Amino acid sequence: KEAFLIALRSPSLRLLLIIAMCCSFAGYSILGWGPTFYIRVHGMTTMQVGGLMGLAVAGGLFIGNVGAGRIADRVAKGDFAVYMQVAGWGTILAAPFGLLFLLAADPMLSLVGLFFSKLFMTFWMPPTYAVAVGMSPVRNRGMITALLTLSTTVVGIGMGPVFVGVMNDLLEPSFGKEAIRYSLVFVLGGLVACGLLCFVGTKLVRREIAARPVTAQ
């Protein structure tokens, strides 16, 4: 309860929760419907999807997570506002690669787009978790992190794939099997929103630190 109230009272932490929701909305939608996309649109077998898509997603997420943390630490030097900028640029860069993933006619080119979109898509996570921990009281950091993770799970898994399914049903009469392609294009808006909100977060973080200095441990 205490951690929840702290998150509600802090503009920075509230925004971080929204950022997590926007990014996970796009991320889990692609993970959930990506295999269907490759099977319907590119005619892949389930074995091909498991191998090729799995490699692109796993590789992108691994490099993106490690790279985002490394870049944020090196560039920010402890400045939480700069951490937010790293997260913002990463998620915005993910959107054009997401379009390449979805709109490319060649399946291999689509997989390249998927790899880089996943790489940049995950740039939001290490910096924003670092900011959430640093902006929280020491005794509540575990619960604040839990709230952040819960928000990604509830919105990402609970709403993202459902939204794509509804959009697919609406678009299928007009686009047939291509409906899944355009249904997934809509969720890329979550990445753009996430990136823009990260830049808004730089101001909120600086303002909150100036009003209530926090010593990160």
Descriptions of predicted regions:
Residues 9-68, 120-129, 156-164:
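Extracytoplasmic gate region of multi-pass secondary transporters
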Residues 78-128:
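C-terminal transmembrane helical hairpin of 12-TM major facilitator-type secondary transporters
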